[in-house]
Amino acid sequence: MLSYNIDIGGITALSIMTELATSHKTKIVIANYLEIVPTIANPNSLFMYMYDDIKQCIYINFSIPETLKIFSEAKNNARKALQNSDGLIIPGNVNMVDARLFGEVISPNDVKLHNLERNIAEMALIHVATQRGIPILGICGGIKFLILILVARSVITVKIIIYM
C-alpha cells in the first residue's frame, strides 16, 4: 500500500513503485488520501483556538460532530485500504506536517504549505497499520511524519491517536 496522489505525483513514490513492481514483482496498491479523507470544506472549524497573555495555543475540537466524523471516516477508509496489504509506504511530499494537529499555531501565510486532509489520512493509515502489525516504510517527509505520529508524547498527540 502506497500513500500517493497521482495528480500531485512525486519522484520518490514513482521510483519506489517502479522498483517494487519490476525487481520484486510486488503488487502496488495506491491509497489516494483524497479517497480516505474527502476535502474538508472548512478546516479551521476542526480547531479551537485559545489565547492568553502568555501563550496562544490551539487544539483539535473533538466536541463538534464534524471532527469526529472526519476522523472516524478516515479510520474506516484506512481499514478498507489496508485490508489486503502486507506493508505501508509513506513517501515524502512537498507539504509540511500540519502543526495544528499537534497543538501549534501556524501563520496564515503558511496554511497553503499544509495539507490537512493528507495528514489525517496518513495518520489513519499509520494507526491502522500499527494496530494490525503491518510494517511501515517512511521516506524523507514520510519518516518525519511517522516519527511525529509514533513517538511524539504531547497530550494533543495522545488525544488524536485515541480518536483515530
UniProtKB/Swiss-Prot annotation:
Glutamine amidotransferase type-1 domain ranges (all copies): 39-164
PROSITE patterns found in the cross-reference section: GATASE_TYPE_1
Biological classification of the source: Bacteria, Pseudomonadati, Pseudomonadota, Alphaproteobacteria, Rickettsiales
GO molecular function terms attached to this record: hydrolase activity; transferase activity
Signal peptide: none
InterPro entries xref list: Class_I_gatase-like, Peptidase_C26
Domain of life, source organism: Bacteria
Keywords: Glutamine amidotransferase, Transferase
Protein name (Swiss-Prot/TrEMBL): Putative glutamine amidotransferase-like protein RP713
Source organism: Rickettsia prowazekii (strain Madrid E)
